[in-house]
Amino acid sequence: MMKIVFMGTPEFAVPSLERLIKEFGVKAVFTQPDRPKGRGKKLSISPIKEVALRENIKILQPQKLRDDREAIEFLKKLSPDFIIVVAYGQILSKEILDIPKYGCINLHASLLPKYRGAAPINWAIINGEKFSGNTTMFMDVGLDTGDMLLKDEFKIEDNTTAGELHNKLMESGGELLVKTINGLVEDSIEPEKQKDEESCYASMLDKKMAKINWNLESEDIKNLIKGLNPWPLAYTYYKGTMMKIYEAEIIDKKEDFSPGFIIDVSKGGIKVATKDGILLLKKIQFPSKKPMYVEEYIRGNKIEKGIILE
């Protein structure tokens, strides 16, 4: 009987845990401690804890696993075949990495060695990559630097947002983990070292990077809009008021206007000049209003052409 311990926290990790429960069973789940959330600061449990409670699996929530002797001794006593890690949010010490028979396996949402780090899905889209995917790897003490095991690859379609790619990779990750576990048990996978010279780092997102620079090319602005949807959302200022942008498309036409200039407003959207052409803003949101397509917004509100977005 296979002994698997799962470590994960957000929604992204849920299908992986559910698939492993179905295929092998899971002996214990590690997830981040409950956190205060919302205005009432009510304690909120992680999506992974919800699954573990539902499935009646033992739950451990150490504040800092690497320093928690009780949790480490629990793992040593259990002596698992695998520790599977999907977006857990804590770094594992060498002492923990050495516990399982076959090793600690991580599912990472990029085609490693590209996009190591916290926000691989977003940066793949912001940088205009044509492909993305999941990679399983042996964990070592570095950040996403371990030997690679298996990959699945997807084409990033032209209008794919970070949210859509997140969901696609989230749903496919569990199957890749099952193949990885079976392959390691059967000794049919040849681990592959990462080439550090081909790596790049996907740093955490912050709201400062979400402000649109209209002096960039249309393609770069469109990629930023897609890559920051659903969070933190790219934005600009219309007459001093923040306008978030959910969706845009490039118009292949060069007009001689200053970047950020609103050329036209119609049901189809807001035409804005960029460094090399025109971007059509299709779905927007103003403070305290819901996101709307421009066609709907201009029925009851005015957006003037001739204004420069800042």
Swiss-Prot record:
InterPro entries: Fmt, Formyl_trans_C, Formyl_transf_N, Formyl_transf_N_sf, Formyl_transferase-like_C_sf, GART_AS, Met-tRNA-FMT_C, Met-tRNA-FMT_N. GO terms for molecular function: methionyl-tRNA formyltransferase activity. Its EC number is 2.1.2.9. It catalyses: L-methionyl-tRNA(fMet) + (6R)-10-formyltetrahydrofolate = N-formyl-L-methionyl-tRNA(fMet) + (6S)-5,6,7,8-tetrahydrofolate + H(+). One of its GO terms (cellular component) is cytosol. It comes from the Bacteria. It is an enzyme of class 2 (transferase). Coiled coil: none annotated. (6S)-5,6,7,8-tetrahydrofolate binds at S110, L111, L112, P113. Keywords: Protein biosynthesis, Transferase. Belongs to the Fmt family. Attaches a formyl group to the free amino group of methionyl-tRNA(fMet). The formyl group appears to play a dual role in the initiator identity of N-formylmethionyl-tRNA by promoting its recognition by IF2 and preventing the misappropriation of this tRNA by the elongation apparatus. This is Methionyl-tRNA formyltransferase. It comes from Clostridium tetani (strain Massachusetts / E88). The gene is fmt.
